[in-house]
Amino acid sequence: MRVNNLTPQDLKAYGINDVQDIVYNPSYDTLYQEELNPGLEGYERGVLTNLGAVAVDTGIFTGRSPKDKYIVRDDTTRDTLWWSDKGKGKNDNKPLSQETWQHLKGLVTHQLSGKRLFIVDAFCGANADTRLSVRFITEVAWQAHFVKNMFIRPTDEELVGFKPDFIVMNGAKCTNPQWKEQGLNSENFVAFNLTERIQLIGGTWYGGEMKKGMFSVMNYLLPLKGIASMHCSANVGEKGDVAVFFGLSGTGKTTLSTDPKRRLIGDDEHGWDDDGVFNFEGGCYAKTIKLSKEAEPEIYHAIRRDALLENVTVREDGTVDFDDGSKTENTRVSYPIYHIDNIVKPVSKAGHATKVIFLTADAFGVLPPVSRLTANQTQYHFLSGFTAKLAGTERGVTEPTPTFSACFGAAFLTLHPTQYAEVLVKRMQAAGAQAYLVNTGWNGTGKRISIKDTRAIIDAILNGSLDNAETFRLPLFDLAIPTELPGVDTHILDPRNTYASPEQWQEKATALAKLFIENFEKYTDTPAGEALVSAGPKL
């Protein structure tokens, strides 16, 4: 149903001229036909899988390009944004001049001019009073499919007279040949102008740039209004008890919040205001590497018609090899949230959170599977945002690579991290919420803590049995660990037990503690940050 009389003439206001045709808010059936059009070439063309979902490739860009992210520095942003060239903390918010912005905008509008375009109008944010109305403009059908999956789909009534607050122009096929003279990182770019309220994409086909681009914008707008903006998943129990799960990619946010006993609010991006927790999105973007029907049935069954697979290996018979990471370990699927049966309806929001869970995948094997945090430890570990990855080396030796990402999402923060911590703590205090640190990574055995044990730990947090358990303190990190929990092997609760000797743990723990201390140094330039040092490890 065409409910918005958008014409090529309207696009001239954006600098896009001579548009051949507009496919406005296409249906899933239309997108399916467009993506599988045999006349398409290269990364535009989709492949049908035996699961019913279309699969696409994003080329060399199988993840975001943080080094190619820029924000126009002007009167709107000069004094509010967390800039990469100011202060101690490193981030991806590189300043862009107005002159270079105009050049990039010209490249993208030229690329989109004279084309047949897909335009998707959608919402970012489930609360009507704080949501963004976003217009996505692309020449690629599957990119329109991606944003239709990931953002909140308006009703026909809401599309009448839709006025965008933000425009995303995706010119994936164009690059910037003048990047060197302009002092940029490469010919590719993901640029934002918060005054004009436009995002430009050039050179990268990765769909996640549109998703995380809008997250970065929400991360700018909401905390300035006192609303928490969070890189987390969220779900709600039968009694209305809400839990949020913070964590970097690969720590288990999507897996652990997709729980048959609880209704899903969302799997990645949320706000927390005076009414409670609400989703920014209308879909899920799940990792699929080594996905199995047995371990993650809800996600597996969500991969059907209207879902969109990215960078997976599709065999000649249409079956998908989820174990093959030859294109990338970051294989993904996007699907509308209603592909998960157990969701909050009709709007993805619920009350205030009472359980706040920080997920870390510690490849050093030092941190306990679970610990209960004090108020100061909550802020310390939120600002630290620690996880660690196992990276294979040429000789097959695996050494852990530590990652400290402020607020478990530094790549998407547009304000200083302490602003997010302050807003979160205020919301937690008002709701009487308790925080926990959960390690979904490794221990001294060299094996990853099983999903079965981690799920039992999450159950113990959510049903309150962990709060009633006896605890002991782990040296160096001063973390409160339960002595036993239902359904969890007691032996693994103390990470020292999983080593051949306590001295081995002590050696690794000392090395990790030093990394925490070095990382937190960047927050000690404020009295609030200095006061939190004592909540971290002590050597």
Curated annotation (Swiss-Prot):
Keyword Membrane: no
Name of this chain's protein: Phosphoenolpyruvate carboxykinase (ATP)
Purpose: Involved in the gluconeogenesis. Catalyzes the conversion of oxaloacetate (OAA) to phosphoenolpyruvate (PEP) through direct phosphoryl transfer between the nucleoside triphosphate and OAA.
Organism expressing this protein natively: Salmonella paratyphi B (strain ATCC BAA-1250 / SPB7)
Entry-linked InterPro entries: PEP_carboxykinase_ATP, PEP_carboxykinase_C, PEP_carboxykinase_N, PEPCK_ATP_CS
Gene: pckA
HAMAP family tied to this protein: PEPCK_ATP
Oligomeric form and interacting partners: Monomer.
PROSITE patterns: PEPCK_ATP
EC class (word): lyase
Chain positions recorded as ATP binding sites: 212, 231, 247-255, 296, 332, 448-449, 454
